């Protein structure tokens, strides 16, 4: 198959019928859940992937998961699934293909982690699960979720592969049956290199997952890597795709990798902003940003804060300034060596520092539960990226606060697009400040 042009895509079906599923009375959030069923050969596919119409569960115990998984879920303190988990897990554990859009913090990662672990029957030396994501930190985080939920499944081995590290170490791990993983979490470039050099065998893969699928598939080079990896896996497998944002343009591309998929869209496109997240802007001059930031860090109550800037240089300079001003801060950006980025991510996650200055490398999918304040020191240029940024605060249905600095006509234009795109009113931050109870959990 040629690699030239966007039409070089794997495609299983052109003729789909959408069936609306009643998703009312879940909670206060509106849920738009649709099931797409292939018209031709639907019976065969349904038998193969599992029948899913009308299946609903209200507690994790209702999913009838393996005892080892149920025990790990209890250890994590989870009892009731989120909207996306409630709609998706009952079908995904039976092998149904999934295309899922749900806003940040609703537990999409747990959907595919629990579903693949439920189906996993580990065989020494065989890779059964492949998870692809666009960022190294996200790959590391997903691996940790697998470790957390497989803690009572001692035979299950998980590995993470990403660029910036010696590929020889990956090869050594893969060729040894004692260390070879059953679950592989990887970025597309490194996994393609392992496939190309015949260092990994994907002929036994049963579950193929793409997290942040819009970001992975919208870039042609990354999409081509995914296609090459996809071709190295069996045709008969489960495919699941997840993202917080899923435009109408990218959905057909995603569907070409899927067979008879369950499609879940939690909240429609205009309501993707986070429940419980207070959002404000502050209009100021560029040279006023540092003073205003220091004032906010002094005045606001927060557990951890992430401050987004537009470049590596600004991240380094702002972090230096904050530390000199007695605001101990850590910085994370894409120009760091991989080991350093991971070490700093871990340090921030483990609460060694309360303030993190970052470029958009932390703008997608990163879960750090203590973050309840996000500040756009430099406002993003894209509305969708705004959602991913502010989604770092107020995750898992908790409260949070997002403040954006607006310092140019371009920023004002972007702010308008954000409000229009997500049908949300972002108010000006009051001079007297705000009540901490509006953005802090009790």
UniProtKB/Swiss-Prot annotation:
Q: Which residues form the Helicase ATP-binding domain?
A: 89-264
In its keyword annotation, does this UniProt entry include Cell division? no
Which top EC class is given? hydrolase
Q: State the EC number(s).
A: 3.6.4.13
Motif DECD box extends across 211-214
Where in or outside the cell it occurs: the entry states:
Nucleus
Q: Which GO terms describe its molecular function?
A: ATP binding; ATP hydrolysis activity; RNA binding; RNA helicase activity
Its Gene Ontology cellular component terms are: spliceosomal complex
Keyword terms:
ATP-binding, Helicase, Hydrolase, mRNA processing, mRNA splicing, mRNA transport, Nucleotide-binding, Nucleus, RNA-binding, Spliceosome, Transport
Q: Does the keyword ATP-binding apply?
A: yes
Q: What is its main location?
A: nucleus
Domain Helicase C-terminal: from-to ranges: 292-437
Q: Name one Pfam family in it.
A: DEAD
Where would I look for the motif Q motif in this sequence? 58-86
What is the protein's known function? ATP-binding RNA helicase involved in transcription elongation and required for the export of mRNA out of the nucleus. SUB2 also plays a role in pre-mRNA splicing and spliceosome assembly. May be involved in rDNA and telomeric silencing, and maintenance of genome integrity.
Q: What is known of its domains?
A: The Q motif is unique to and characteristic of the DEAD box family of RNA helicases and controls ATP binding and hydrolysis.
Give the family from UniProt: Belongs to the DEAD box helicase family. DECD subfamily.
Which PANTHER family does this entry report, sorted A to Z?
Answer: ATP-DEPENDENT RNA HELICASE DBP3 (PTHR47958)
Q: What is this protein called?
A: ATP-dependent RNA helicase SUB2-2
Protein species of origin: Vanderwaltozyma polyspora (strain ATCC 22028 / DSM 70294 / BCRC 21397 / CBS 2163 / NBRC 10782 / NRRL Y-8283 / UCD 57-17) (Kluyveromyces polysporus)
Q: Gene name on record? A: SUB2-2
């Amino acid at each position: 198959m040629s690699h030239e042009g966007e039409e070089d895509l794997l495609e299983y079906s052109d003729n789909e019928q959408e069936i609306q599923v009643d998703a009312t009375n879940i909670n206060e959030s509106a849920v738009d859940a649709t099931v797409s069923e292939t018209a031709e050969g639907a019976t065969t596919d349904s038998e193969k992937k599992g029948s899913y119409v009308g299946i609903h569960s209200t507690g994790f115990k209702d999913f009838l998961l393996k005892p080892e998984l149920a025990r790990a879920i209890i250890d994590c303190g989870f009892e009731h699934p989120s909207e996306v988990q409630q709609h998706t897990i009952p079908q995904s554990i039976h092998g149904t293909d999934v295309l899922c859009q749900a806003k940040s913090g609703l537990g999409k990662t747990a959907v595919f982690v629990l579903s693949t672990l439920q189906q996993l029957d580990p065989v020494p030396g065989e890779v059964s699960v492949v998870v692809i994501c666009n960022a190294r930190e996200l790959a590391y985080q997903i691996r940790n979720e697998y470790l957390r939920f497989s803690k009572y499944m001692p035979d299950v081995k998980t590995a993470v592969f990403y660029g910036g590290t010696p590929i020889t170490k990956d090869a050594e791990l893969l060729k040894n049956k004692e260390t070879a993983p059953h679950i592989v979490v990887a970025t597309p470039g490194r996994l393609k290199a392992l496939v190309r050099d015949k260092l990994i065998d994907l002929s036994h893969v049963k579950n193929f997952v793409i997290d942040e699928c819009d970001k992975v598939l919208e870039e042609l080079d990354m999409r081509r890597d995914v296609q090459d990896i996809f071709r190295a896996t069996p045709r008969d497998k489960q495919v699941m795709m997840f993202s917080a944002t899923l435009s109408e343009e990218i959905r057909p591309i995603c569907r070409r990798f899927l067979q008879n998929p369950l499609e879940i869209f939690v909240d429609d496109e205009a309501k993707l902003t986070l429940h419980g997240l207070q959002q404000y802007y502050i209009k100021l001059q560029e040279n006023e940003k540092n003073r205003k930031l220091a004032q906010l860090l002094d005045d606001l109550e927060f557990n951890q804060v992430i401050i987004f800037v537009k470049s590596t240089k600004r991240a380094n300079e702002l972090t230096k300034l904050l530390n000199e001003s007695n605001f101990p801060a850590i910085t994370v950006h894409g120009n760091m060596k991989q080991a350093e980025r991971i070490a700093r991510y871990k340090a921030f996650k483990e609460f060694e520092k309360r303030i993190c200055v970052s470029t958009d490398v932390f703008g997608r999918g990163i879960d750090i539960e203590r973050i309840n304040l996000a500040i756009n020191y430099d406002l993003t240029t894209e509305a969708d990226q705004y959602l991913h940024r502010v989604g770092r605060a107020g995750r898992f249905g908790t409260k949070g606060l997002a403040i954006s600095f607006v310092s140019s006509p371009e920023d004002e234009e972007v702010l308008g697009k954000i409000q229009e795109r997500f049908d949300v009113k972002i108010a000006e931050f009051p001079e007297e400040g705000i009540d901490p109870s509006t953005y802090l959990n009790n």
